[in-house]
Amino acid sequence: KLMKQGGAALEGSALANGRALSAGSPPVPPGWNRIPPLGRAQEE
């Protein structure tokens, strides 16, 4: 579970980073912060 969560978090970070780079907007960081918790809730 730990490894899966870590992988999911890494994937989410990569996606968030890609979106942030593409969007280049300030409202992106907040979303990135909200993504990890959502992923964890779904994984659990």
Swiss-Prot record:
Residue ranges crossing the lipid bilayer per the database entry: none
Subcellular location per the Swiss-Prot or TrEMBL entry: Nucleus
GO molecular function: chromatin binding; DNA binding; DNA-binding transcription factor activity, RNA polymerase II-specific; RNA polymerase II transcription regulatory region sequence-specific DNA binding; sequence-specific double-stranded DNA binding
Region span, Disordered: 19-44
Keywords recorded for this protein, A-Z: Activator, Developmental protein, Differentiation, DNA-binding, Homeobox, Nucleus, Repressor, Transcription, Transcription regulation
Coiled coil: none
One Gene Ontology cellular component annotation held by this UniProt entry: nucleus
Any GO BP annotation: oligodendrocyte differentiation
UniProt domain comment: The homeobox DNA-binding domain is necessary for its nuclear localization, transcriptional and erythroid differentiation activities.
Family: Belongs to the distal-less homeobox family.
Function: Plays a role as a transcriptional activator or repressor. Inhibits several cytokine signaling pathways, such as TGFB1, activin-A/INHBA and BMP4 by interfering with the transcriptional stimulatory activity of transcription factors, such as MSX2, FAST2, SMAD2 and SMAD3 during hematopoietic cell differentiation. Plays a role in terminal differentiation of interneurons, such as amacrine and bipolar cells in the developing retina. Likely to play a regulatory role in the development of the ventral forebrain.
Quaternary structure (record): Interacts with SMAD4 (via homeobox DNA-binding domain). Interacts (via homeobox DNA-binding domain) with POU4F2; this interaction suppresses DLX1-mediated transcriptional activity in postnatal retina and enhances retinal ganglion cell (RGC) differentiation.
The protein's name: Homeobox protein DLX-1
Organism per entry: Rattus norvegicus
Taxonomic path: Eukaryota, Metazoa, Chordata, Craniata, Vertebrata
Gene: Dlx1
